[in-house]
Curated annotation (Swiss-Prot):
Principal place of residence: membrane
InterPro entries membership: Ion_transpt_RnfA/RsxA, NqrDE/RnfAE, NqrDE/RnfAE_oxidrdctase
BP GO annotations: electron transport chain
Higher taxonomy: Bacteria, Pseudomonadati, Pseudomonadota, Gammaproteobacteria, Oceanospirillales
Subunit structure: The complex is composed of six subunits: RnfA, RnfB, RnfC, RnfD, RnfE and RnfG.
Protein name, UniProt field: Ion-translocating oxidoreductase complex subunit A
NCBIfam families in alphabetical order: PRK05151.1 (NF003481), rnfA (TIGR01943)
Domain of life: Bacteria
Organism: Alcanivorax borkumensis (strain ATCC 700651 / DSM 11573 / NCIMB 13689 / SK2)
Keyword annotations from UniProtKB, A to Z: Cell inner membrane, Cell membrane, Electron transport, Membrane, Translocase, Transmembrane, Transmembrane helix, Transport
Keyword Transferase recorded: no
Function: Part of a membrane-bound complex that couples electron transfer with translocation of ions across the membrane.
The protein's Enzyme Commission number: 7.-.-.-
Gene: rnfA
Keyword Electron transport appears in the UniProt entry: yes
């Protein structure tokens, strides 16, 4: 049980995929103008990232490794992610049309989110990966992505009404803010050693 808590804390804070490993920067910068859109994107990404992490592990452990097809890892994980996104889109459309309209634009964007593929690839590189560790790692990465995305969106909303010098307006102040957030998350770097 302690191992899973450590994996979760490590994925959320210590090795955050956006601020430490620089994965998922496109949605991080592109969808973080408003907190509402950031929450929608983070909700959809949390579900897809967790699901695709587990499916990628199962594909790796029960198809690719037994049949010695490890070289097909990347292409098979891209296929798994696309299937997970399509499944999620169909399920949400059927279960909650209102939620589908809210998340509709974000679901196709998740397919091209490099953080989802990065989590799947890094997940199977662990020597002692199990089903539960893959689930925990994927969920922790998703929570870390969501946390950073929502915090960054809240800061960008505050910056939008602040008196920022002309040269720093727009993406410039966004990148400076992201850098400062990354420095803040570096404070967690000695917290856990796995």
């Amino acid at each position: 049980m302690t191992e899973y808590v450590l994996i979760l804390i490590s994925a959320v804070l210590v090795n955050n995929f956006v601020l430490v490993q620089f994965l998922g920067l496109c949605p991080f910068m592109g969808v973080s103008n408003k907190v509402e859109t950031a929450m929608g994107m983070s909700l959809a990404t949390t579900f897809v990232l967790t699901l695709s992490s587990v499916l990628a592990y199962l594909t790796w452990a029960y198809i690719l490794v037994p049949f010695e097809l490890e070289y097909l890892r990347t292409i098979s994980f891209i296929l798994v992610i696309a299937v997970a996104v399509q499944f999620t889109e169909m399920f949400v459309k059927k279960a909650s049309p209102l939620l589908y309209r809210v998340l509709g634009v974000f679901l196709p964007l998740i397919t091209s989110n490099c953080a989802v593929l990065g989590v799947a690839l890094l997940n199977v590189r662990q020597e002692d990966a199990t089903f539960m560790s893959s689930l925990t790692y994927g969920f922790g990465a998703a929570i870390g992505f969501s946390l950073v995305l929502i915090l960054f969106a809240a800061m960008r909303e505050r910056i939008a009404v602040a008196d920022v010098p002309e040269a720093f307006r727009g993406p410039s102040i966004g990148l400076i803010t992201a850098g400062l957030m990354s420095l803040a998350f570096m404070g967690f770097s000695g917290l856990i050693k796995l």
